[in-house]
Amino acid sequence: MISTVVISRDRPAQLHLLLESIQRNGGNLFHLTVLFEASSEYFLEGYIKAQQFFSKKNRKDFNFPIRWKQRESSNLNEDLLKILSNSRELVCLFNDQNILFERVSSYKKIKKLFSTHSMSALSLRLGNNTVIQNPYESGNYLADRPKEGEFDLDRFLIWDATKIKSYTNFGMPFSTNGHIYHENLIKNVLKRTKVEDHDNFELEVQKGLYKGSFSGKIPPSMACTEYSVVICNSCERISDSIGKYDNTEIGINHRYIEGNIIDYDSFDFSNISKPYEDFTAFFK
């Protein structure tokens, strides 16, 4: 199993969707810990509801239990390091806007990939299909993708990330959108960086990488699955019959507290072309 941390702040309903998707498509690959932060008692109520739901469900369905940890430190990385103090050899980071929409390769194949290649990360959000970088900028529409690399174990693409444009999808080894790391590498990176707000994780860690803070410690190669299996969905577009709540995090949490959950089966994952989507979320 892969030691896996899901980072969440004020999004218990979206977290529920991710956990459901992992249980549907993750098999027994991920050993889950949720690191959550609630800015109010009402959001905390949402997290308690999610915890109770999955605790009951896991006993019934014989899923591995999910551990829950509330954020304590002003530096997010300190909390991550505490959780990962007794981690397994491989570590995966998700956040509460992710959805795992396809099955992932077996642990045996992923471990073999890391054993036979020196890599910074295996990305589950990238693949041959993620050709778009930014759909709202004509000059930055298409992703800077690897022009050369390897195809290993019939499932993984491997390339030199240092040859990719900085701060673009295929040039960013450090992400909480379904990236898998060797435990020693990610722990070293977390120790050398400070992240106060999860939304700045990619920017702060990548900034350290490009400044040379991890000089000589980060392999230039990274990898991805042949086709992406994870997306980040904003849930800014909502469709339901409840007219009294808006699409803000507060409104979404109100729906969740009242017993409505985001319907995983309402999403169409057949034409994914970028790691970030803006699908309409349907509540049921």
Predicted regions located by residue number:
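Conserved catalytic core of nucleotide-sugar-dependent glycosyltransferases
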Residues: S106-K194
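Short beta-strand-to-loop acidic/aromatic patch adjacent to the donor-nucleotide binding site
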Residues: R88-I99
